[in-house]
């Protein structure tokens, strides 16, 4: 392969990784749709068991047709165990917070995870924080503040906030571990094992909190199926490629589209008002995403043309 072909391949992977980062954020931003199952009396662990259980079945079928081996070595086992437990903790604490505060508010507070990701990478892995990265973090964080700040001074649940912050921290570490583990396997295989931990963990939590609850009607099953395919399978698969091709911090910052998606769901599906404050917040978040994407592409071009 010539140098030009190699450089073109690297550039295409960078673009693909950026698109996957955006896609993962939008897909994951549809998580609030699952909160409507709470109106039927379902608890977070039961909702998540069906979500991850169905996702696991779909992934298993895909892998069967791909004839992909499930064999892993000891290092991969430890890495996949860590990823599974981290995603289990992040998803469960987020869905628990949905019972204590508005899902849109919880989804926007979750966005502190890019700040945590950048901080962890700088503190423990000596990753340099450039001006554009810092600017993106500031713009996106201010945008999120505008999305969930209430002018009437409404007080949020302290327990709910703590749960969301735990979700953000474990999600940030998940992204970093995914990037640092350098797992030489397909995204389907990675998520096959991640989903095992998530499904079994939530099943155990469900039985510890009164027993597993089953969706009672077609609408509920449709909602669970959506949660299994979109924010579980699609988001997880795209997250693998994003972290692999563009790194932890850009992937996390592109997650700014998660709260934006949550707000748009509230506006178009639940009739929530669209105010100038929301418009400014969304604009700042999109600006942050554009800056980090341009910064990533500029860095790639510099490395290709010394």
Range-by-range predicted roles:
Residues 1-46, 85, 93, 153-180, ...:
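Glycine-/small-residue-enriched transmembrane alpha-helix faces in small-molecule transporters
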Residues 2-10, 52, 149-150, 220-222, ...:
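C-terminal-most transmembrane helix of multi-pass membrane proteins
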Residues 7, 30-33, 37, 41, ...:
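Membrane-interface helix-cap regions at the ends of transmembrane helices
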Residues 15-20, 46-61, 65, 77-78, ...:
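Hydrophobic alpha-helical transmembrane segments of multi-pass integral membrane proteins
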Residues 25, 50, 106-112, 178-199, ...:
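Helix-helix packing/entry segments at the starts of transmembrane helices
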Residues 27, 31-32, 60-106, 110, ...:
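Specific transmembrane alpha-helical segments of multi-pass solute transporters/efflux pumps
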Residues 59, 81, 87, 120, ...:
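Hydrophobic transmembrane alpha-helices of multi-pass small-molecule transport proteins
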Residues 73-78, 110, 126-146, 154-161, ...:
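Loop-to-transmembrane alpha-helix entry segments
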